[in-house]
């Protein structure tokens, strides 16, 4: 069943119900079987799969709370902290713990929680588990911040759940509550109500009514009771008759049926009727059939002493159809079902929540006759008490003295009338059942033998009497309602107001019905006839009043003026005529009694008196109130002009409602005045008549009573008006949608305001954002709340809503910038990499969660709509995308308080960054921020001066303790708006955010992946971590500690202590009045006073003194303003930047960087290699000891520079660049520096030259323009940078750089190094051994070496894009003899250098070809496969990396192959050379032409083992060989001898002797008759053409001969013929020397004849090819004797083999 609980649902309602599909099928079957509608509360979705899995469900004996998070979701944890109560107050947890103990003490068990794999899958899909690694479970729930959970697989394939507190030692099992059998429990399926059909009780009603007697007996008792009742029409007898009539119905519907009680100690925990019990058992039997446990454990909410108020109810009809209904829909549905004969039994013991549900949804349901509603006195008198309480009387209720005041704060009257309402619906059904029973009884009377006609007559009379009583009750009810509504503080709902209106308009009809029915019932009783004549008149007057009231109501309609005037006339006529008619009836009756008759005469004077009475009846205060009400409507019209433009029409609707209310109340006031006047006139006329004073008295009493009734009807009239407007709202989409338009309109109004657009545009500029995402929380308007209250819709709206827009430059743009989930508290920013959005909250962001509203009667005529926020109220989660986002949290609500302002909880913020560089502007809330990738910043600048933060580093995390003292925080609470509507008062709660001041508040933020932290205005303490942090204290006396990493520290205003810690830190200071303590710690640290700080703006500066800083003393003296002085104490600071004023700065003995910035500064470097920069202004710079650098950037002043000791440099590279100059320089160059004359001339854009005095300076760096740099007799470094520079070194070993441009470089005397750089440069070395460094390939430079041994170096050229464009792998082509270097790897290219006087060349990293000249050259190949040729002279060739080719040519040369497989071309006749192969397998080659081997010359004699090579028999021609592996001979007769390594020896032409030596060698004889001896090792021998001889013997290893045909070839083996064993191995011939491991293979001997040798010699014998074949065939007949046998054993060899050996070896 586990696999199918989500499958098989018939519709969306089934799925939403949470009931497993298989169980639900059984429920529908039971509904059909029992002919009853079944209603259920929604099942927790986390319990759905558990029920389907067969988990047991809890009964009423379990009071503990289930869990809605983590692995235990749906179960009932023994530890309340693991339940849905997690995070609640300690006292709540303590009470929950008691509930758990109570459950365990009464038959329940604690069970170790285990889960199935399917359950784990569900938890993942539901988002309750977000990950699992090695059994450890992850989740987003806050509980996982306090607890760790893991699962372990058990032997039965389930997973045991364990937990421990974070940081705890051992895991323990999670225990949940189970039943007595040890099966875990989950929530059961709660039945809300059952509606059985009346047909279920027809038989039981009859037997119950008769109580064992016949129907005839029952009717006889009824007849006798009715006979007794005819003695009078007093209240007691009418009640008695009514009770008799309904006796059977009450029992029939089960309200008095046997109940089942279960007890737990003295507590009544459950009530269930017989029918409910029957249904429950049927449902559980169906559940068992599909593998579930009991799913329903108790009765319905109809018998629950503490019922719930649900927003939705799941309904299964008697036909098996299912649907999901809201409260309002349920009300209508129950009414429809009642009309079809189904009985709904309400709960009599509802508390506040339950009563509200039935007041709003069921109290005025269709099918409940108005006569059976709350205020019927007979109903009230017969209401039984709730359990344990006494029954109130009507009088007690009206006095509000019923003893109910202690119940949950509910007013006594409200609770009592609630019981009446509950009874009203039941008694309506009882009335219908009574009628059925009485009709059945009458028919039974007629059918039974022996029953007289009188019995049938009394049956009819009993029914008639019941109808009379019903009609009378309707009349009494209508009058009671009118009276009740006229009292101050009356309690009534909008539904009651509707009932009242119906009663008022039906008054005339009710009066006639009562008169007719009662007269018929008592027909024949003459003593009552006269009385009812008067009663008939009174009822006729009642009809007139009703008509008058109806006409008055028409005045409230939107009717033409003429129609309203007619209605007013109708009022006067009806009331006047009715009153006169009543008075006439009374007068005539009295006159008849006295036998006196007389006409009615009204004197003119009496009419005048009546007019006076009319004027007196109009109250000035009443008129004033109506006028004020009209003015308020005008104000609402003004509001409507703007709200209507944004789609909300409610203000206009409310204005019209008040105008209609004003008209209605004016009409009632006028009618009342007219009635008083008419009454007075009638009394006067009666007094003048014959009837005299009695008529006047009666008339006065009647008109006074009617006037009171009319005033009482005023409230129903305006209530009907409110109902009419409520219907209008329903017709316009319903209240929820209607009032949401108010929120939308208020949002649009603000979003389109000029002020907001400007503010957001400024924010975008200030934050350097690409757009601003504005989140606006909008509160409903006061006028909308007022309209909702009047129309009874205050519980059908939202008081706040959240809207999101994107703005660019203050204008709204399309797109969905965030995904907002208010219910779950989620904000996801939809941003992409490269964007720079900013998120801000335009209005304070309210708490997350959904709003639930409940309207409850709280006084006589008072209603209160309560609001409650449900869901995840304590946390917002904000998730960023990949952009660089600014998130402003300043206006996020930090606290949630209740209606009394008591703190419920703080609201936390989870902010999850993306890949960008994000900035979070924090507020007072508790924040957890994970910055993710990028460089992220959190700023607390919004905190006040009395607040402080303490930041500590915990590995990758920062913990930020915020101490808020008397701070302002945004707080959300509940406010109440009170609206008086006539006598009705509506108190409507709504969500409201305010800026509140708190005393002391401590919150702790956690920050992860954050690099930058900015403090607030208070005294903060901030400690960094191991990363490169940016820490700013803000205002206040702060303490900053950078920790490890290269940090930037900003103390800000106040007396700060700033510690750099490890790493190269930067301190940003201002010139404030505060003294600070600065400690750089380890690393190279810098203090900067040139950063503009806000505190400087508040100082009126008098003078231009900046700072006096002395790093050696550890002080920085500051003059922030006139007569103000402060000192910063510094230590472990290496670098310091001055202010924008005139500073004095001195370093210490460390390597300092000192920068004056603006102002006329004096800077001393002292010891160490310092960097000094004066900045703008007339500066004096002293380098003193050390190799110092002076950075010059101001060409408009003259500075004084003294380098002092050491090698010092003055650098002008930052002085002139396109961002500085505004016009071409007058002289067309940047600087002219002459160190020999100790000055530097600077050409300014103003055409004025300025000179810097430079002393003791060795080096100069020029500008980007045309410079002239001249050295002195010292070793100078002169760098021209850009422009066409002239650089002259002078004496000394100088380093000259031309930089960009066509430069002229002159080394002059000394061993100079010259770099031309970009451009066509001319470089002259002058005297000395100079070095020319060439770095570009696509230019034409002229290089003149001058005197000395000069070198041109192209090794850096390959690193530039100019080399080998389209010529991949080719370097330079240099020929010193021709004086040309082609730089693109081919001769004749356009990019070449002209060289002269150059002796040495260094090639590139590519393949170069470098040729020397007649001088002694040094040629270096560097990288690549180079070709180096020394030419004449004693040269040095170095191949470098790569497989190089080296040729020394003439002269005594030294050739070094270095790395790679190099090839040396050597002339054997050229003696005295050194050839060193270096790494790799290198080859010496004597084969080339011109190697001294002319005709008649001798061949080469070479020994790699001895390391020499010479002409044959001419040792004086010897050359030294080192690290050479291979050799190639000449065309003569050569002798090539290898060494112990693996050699390749190639004899080429001639009759060569090749000897491999030890190692696995390759010998190639090539042309000629060669002698090849592999010697030791496994060698490959290639004889080639000619008559070749191969030598082999003991100790030679395993050699292979590769013959290719031609010549007469021989193998000579140093062994006896009897030691050789011949065998065929594939196509090869193998010859083995027995007794050894040596073997000789002739490759492909059997493939064809070209691969064979002609003869083999062994000792003094030989064998030819034919003999070899015979030996192979003969030996193939015998097993190989192996290497151990020295010769074939003669004793075992047949004579045939011996004969073959003898015959073939000769």
UniProtKB/Swiss-Prot annotation:
Effect after changing residue 242 to D/G/R/V: Reduced affinity for altered affinity for calmodulin without affecting the adenylate cyclase activity
EC numbers on record: 4.6.1.1
Region described as B, Ala/Gly-rich: 400-912
PTM remark: Released in a processed form.
Lipid-linked residues (N6-palmitoyl lysine): 860, 983
Enzyme class: lyase
Chain residue ranges for the region called Required for interaction with CyaC: 500-698
Region (D, Asp/Gly-rich): 1657-1706
GO cellular component terms given for this protein: extracellular region; host cell plasma membrane; membrane
Record annotation: effect of changing residue 190 to N/Y/H: Loss of adenylate cyclase activity
Effect noted on mutating residue 65 to Q: Abolished adenylate cyclase activity
Residue ranges, annotated region (C): 913-1656
Annotated family: In the N-terminal section; belongs to the adenylyl cyclase class-2 family. In the C-terminal section; belongs to the RTX prokaryotic toxin family.
Protein name: Bifunctional hemolysin/adenylate cyclase
The species this protein was found in: Bordetella pertussis (strain Tohama I / ATCC BAA-589 / NCTC 13251)
Gene name as annotated: cya
């Amino acid at each position: 069943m586990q696999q199918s609980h989500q499958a098989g649902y018939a519709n969306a309602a089934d799925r939403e119900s949470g009931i497993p599909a298989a169980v639900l099928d059984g429920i529908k079957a039971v509904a059909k079987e029992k002919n009853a509608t079944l209603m259920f509360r929604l099942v927790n979705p986390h319990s759905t799969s558990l029920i389907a899995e067969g988990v047991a469900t809890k009964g009423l004996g379990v009071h503990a709370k289930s869990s809605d998070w983590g692995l235990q979701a749906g179960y009932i944890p023994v530890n309340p902290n693991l339940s849905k109560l997690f995070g609640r107050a300690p006292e709540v947890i303590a009470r929950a713990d008691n509930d758990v103990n109570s459950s365990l003490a009464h038959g329940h068990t604690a069970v170790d929680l285990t889960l199935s794999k399917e359950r784990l899958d569900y938890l993942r899909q539901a988002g309750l588990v977000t990950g699992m690694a090695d059994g450890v479970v992850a989740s987003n729930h806050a509980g996982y911040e306090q607890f760790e959970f893991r699962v372990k697989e058990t032997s039965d394939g389930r997973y045991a759940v364990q937990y421990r507190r974070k940081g705890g030692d051992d895991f323990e099992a999670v225990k949940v509550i189970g039943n007595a059998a040890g099966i875990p429990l989950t929530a059961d399926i709660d039945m809300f109500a059952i509606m059985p059909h009346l047909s279920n009780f027809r038989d039981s009603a009859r037997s119950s009514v008769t109580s064992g007697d016949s129907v005839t007996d029952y009717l006889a008792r009824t007849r006798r009771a009715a006979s007794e009742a005819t003695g009078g029409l007093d209240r007691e007898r009418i009640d008695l008759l009514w009770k008799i009539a309904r006796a059977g119905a009450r029992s029939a519907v089960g309200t008095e049926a046997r109940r089942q009680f279960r007890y737990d100690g003295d507590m009544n925990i459950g009530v269930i009727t017989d029918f409910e019990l029957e249904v429950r058992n049927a449902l559980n039997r169906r559940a068992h059939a599909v593998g579930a446990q009991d799913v329903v454990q108790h009765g319905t909410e109809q018998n629950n002493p503490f019922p719930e108020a649900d927003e939705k109810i799941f309904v299964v009809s008697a036909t098996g159809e299912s649907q999901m209904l809201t409260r309002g829909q349920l009300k209508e549905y129950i009414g429809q079902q009642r009309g079809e004969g189904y009985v709904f039994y309400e709960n009599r013991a509802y508390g506040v929540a339950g009563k509200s549900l039935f007041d709003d949804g069921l109290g005025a349901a269709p099918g409940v006759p108005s006569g059976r509603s709350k205020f019927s006195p007979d109903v009230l008198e017969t209401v039984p008490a709730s359990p344990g309480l006494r029954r109130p009387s009507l009088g007690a209720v009206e006095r509000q003295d019923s003893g109910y005041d202690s119940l949950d704060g509910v007013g006594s009257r409200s609770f009592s009338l609630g019981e009446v309402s509950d009874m009203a619906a039941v008694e309506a059904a009882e009335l219908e059942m009574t009628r059925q029973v009485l009709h059945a009884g009458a028919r039974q009377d007629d059918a039974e033998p022996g029953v007289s006609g009188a019995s049938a007559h009394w049956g009819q009379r009993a029914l008639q009497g019941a109808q009379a009583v019903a009609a009378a009750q309707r009349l009494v009810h209508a009058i009671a309602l009118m009276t009740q509504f006229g009292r101050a503080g009356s309690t009534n709902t909008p539904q009651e107001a509707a009932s009242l209106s119906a009663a008022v308009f039906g008054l005339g009809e009710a009066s006639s019905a009562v008169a007719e029915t009662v007269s018929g019932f008592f027909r024949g009783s003459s003593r009552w006839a006269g009385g009812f004549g008067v009663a008939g008149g009174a009822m006729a007057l009642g009809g007139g009043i009703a008509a008058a009231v109806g006409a008055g109501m028409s005045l409230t309609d939107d009717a033409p003026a003429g129609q309203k005037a007619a209605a007013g006339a109708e009022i006067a006529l009806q009331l006047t005529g009715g009153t006169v008619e009543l008075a006439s009836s009374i007068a005539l009756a009295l006159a008849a009694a006295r036998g006196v008759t007389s006409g009615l005469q009204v004197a003119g004077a009496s009419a005048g008196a009546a007019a006076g009475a009319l004027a007196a009846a109009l109250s000035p205060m009443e008129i004033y109130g109506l006028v004020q009400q009209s003015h308020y409507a005008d104000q609402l019209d003004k509001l409507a002009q703007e709200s209507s433009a944004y789609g909300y029409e409610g203000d206009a609707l409310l204005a019209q409602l008040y105008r209609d209310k004003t008209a209605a109340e004016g009409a009632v006031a006028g009618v009342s005045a007219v009635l008083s006047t008419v009454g007075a006139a009638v009394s006067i006329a009666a007094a003048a008549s014959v009837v005299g004073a009695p008529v006047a008295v009666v008339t006065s009493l009647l008109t006074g009573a009617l006037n009171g009734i009319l005033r009482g009807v005023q409230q129903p009239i305006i209530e009907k008006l409110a109902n009419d407007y409520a219907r209008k709202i329903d017709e316009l989409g319903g209240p929820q949608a209607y009032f949401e338009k108010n929120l939308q309109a208020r949002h649009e109004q603000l979003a389109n305001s000029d002020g907001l657009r400007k503010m957001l545009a400024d924010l975008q500029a200030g934050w350097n954002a690409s757009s601003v995402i504005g989140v606006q929380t909008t509160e409903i308007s006061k006028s909308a709340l007022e309209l909702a209250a009047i129309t009874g819709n205050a519980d059908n709206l939202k008081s706040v809503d959240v809207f999101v827009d994107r703005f660019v430059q203050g204008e709204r743009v399309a797109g969905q910038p965030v995904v907002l989930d208010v219910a779950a508290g989620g904000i996801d920013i939809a941003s992409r990499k490269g964007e720079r959005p900013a998120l801000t909250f335009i209005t304070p962001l309210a708490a997350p969660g959904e709003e639930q509203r409940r309207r409850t009667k709280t006084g006589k005529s008072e209603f209160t709509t309560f609001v409650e926020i449900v869901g995840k109220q304590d946390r917002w989660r904000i998730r960023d995308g990949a952009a660089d986002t600014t998130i402003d949290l300043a206006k996020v609500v930090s606290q949630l308080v209740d209606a009394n302002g008591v703190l419920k909880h703080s609201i936390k913020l989870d902010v999850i960054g993306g890949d960008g560089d994000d900035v979070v502007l924090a507020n007072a809330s508790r924040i957890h921020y994970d910055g993710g990738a990028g460089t992220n910043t959190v700023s607390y600048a919004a905190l006040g001066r009395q607040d402080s933060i303490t930041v500590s580093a915990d590995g990758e995390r920062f913990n930020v303790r915020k101490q808020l003292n008397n701070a302002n925080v945004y707080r959300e609470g509940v406010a109440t708006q009170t609206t008086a509507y006539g006598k009705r008062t509506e108190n409507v709660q709504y969500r409201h955010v305010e800026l509140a001041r708190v005393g002391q508040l401590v919150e702790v933020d956690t920050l992860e992946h954050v690099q930058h932290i900015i403090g607030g205005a208070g005294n903060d303490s901030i400690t960094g971590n191991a990363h490169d942090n940016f820490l700013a204290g803000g205002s206040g006396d702060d303490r900053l500690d950078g920790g490890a990493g290269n940090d930037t520290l900003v103390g800000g205003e106040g007396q700060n202590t700033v510690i750099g810690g490890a790493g190269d830190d930067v301190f940003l200071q201002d010139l404030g009045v505060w003294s600070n303590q600065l400690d750089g710690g380890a690393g190279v640290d810098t203090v900067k006073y040139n950063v503009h700080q806000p505190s400087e703006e508040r100082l009126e500066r008098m003078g231009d003194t900046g700072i006096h800083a002395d790093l050696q003393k550890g002080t920085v003296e500051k003059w922030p303003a006139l007569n103000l002085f402060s000192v910063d104490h510094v230590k472990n600071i290496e670098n310091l930047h001055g202010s924008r004023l005139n500073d004095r700065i001195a370093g210490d003995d460390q390597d300092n960087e000192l920068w004056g910035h603006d102002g006329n500064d004096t800077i001393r470097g002292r010891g160490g290699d310092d960097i000094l920069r004066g900045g703008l202004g007339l500066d004096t710079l002293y380098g003193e000891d050390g190799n110092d650098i002076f950075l010059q950037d101001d060409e408009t002043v003259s500075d004084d520079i003294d380098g002092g000791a050491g090698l010092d440099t003055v650098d002008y590279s930052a002085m002139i660049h396109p961002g500085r100059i505004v016009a071409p320089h007058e002289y067309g160059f940047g600087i002219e520096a002459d160190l020999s004359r100790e000055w530097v001339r600077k050409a300014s854009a103003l055409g004025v030259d300025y000179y810097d005095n430079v002393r003791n300076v060795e080096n100069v760096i020029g500008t980007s323009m045309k410079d002239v740099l001249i050295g002195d007799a010292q070793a100078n470094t002169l760098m021209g940078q850009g422009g066409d520079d002239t650089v002259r070194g002078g004496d000394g070993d100088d380093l000259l750089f031309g930089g960009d441009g066509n430069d002229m470089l002159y080394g002059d005397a000394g061993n100079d190094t010259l770099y031309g750089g970009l451009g066509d440069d001319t470089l002259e070395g002058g005297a000395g051994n100079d070095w020319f460094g060439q770095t570009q390939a696509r230019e034409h430079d002229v290089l003149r070496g001058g005197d000395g041994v000069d070198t041109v170096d192209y090794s850096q050229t390959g690193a530039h894009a100019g080399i080998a464009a389209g010529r991949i792998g080719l370097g330079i082509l240099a020929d010193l003899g021709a004086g040309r270097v082609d730089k693109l790897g081919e001769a004749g290219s356009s990019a070449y250098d002209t060289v002269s006087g150059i002796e040495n060349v260094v090639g590139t990293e590519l393949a170069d070809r470098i040729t020397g000249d007649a001088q002694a050259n040094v040629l270096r190949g560097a990288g690549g496969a180079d070709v180096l040729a020394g030419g004449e002279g004693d040269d040095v060739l170095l191949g470098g990396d790569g497989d190089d080719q080296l040729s020394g040519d003439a002269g005594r040369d030294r050739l070094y192959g270095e790395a790679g497989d190099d090839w040396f071309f050597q002339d054997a006749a050229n003696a005295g050379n050194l050839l060193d192969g270096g790494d790799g397998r290198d080859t010496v080659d004597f084969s080339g032409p011109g190697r001294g081997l002319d005709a008649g010359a001798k061949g080469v004699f070479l020994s790699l083992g001895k390391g020499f090579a010479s002409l044959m028999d001419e040792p004086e021609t010897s050359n030294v060989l080192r690290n050479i592996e291979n050799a190639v001979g000449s065309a003569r007769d050569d002798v090539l001898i290898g060494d112990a390594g693996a050699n390749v020896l190639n004899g080429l032409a001639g009759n060569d002797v090749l000897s491999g030596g030890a190692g696995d060698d390759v010998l190639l004889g090539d042309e000629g008759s060669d002698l090849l001896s592999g010697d030791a090792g496994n060698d490959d021998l290639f004889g080639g053409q000619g008559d070749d001889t191969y030598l082999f013997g003991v100790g030679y290893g395993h050699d292979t001969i590769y013959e290719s045909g031609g010549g007469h070839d021989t193998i000579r083996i140093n062994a006896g013929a009897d030691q050789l064993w011949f065998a065929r191995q594939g196509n090869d011939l193998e010859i083995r020397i027995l007794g050894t491991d040596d073997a000789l293979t002739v490759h492909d001997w059997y493939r064809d004849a070209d691969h064979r040798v002609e003869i083999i010699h062994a000792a003094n014998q030989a064998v030819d090819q034919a003999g070899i074949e015979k030996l192979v065939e003969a030996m193939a007949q015998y097993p190989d004797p192996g290497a151990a046998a020295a010769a074939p054993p003669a004793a075992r060899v047949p004579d045939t083999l011996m004969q073959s050996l003898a015959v073939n070896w000769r």
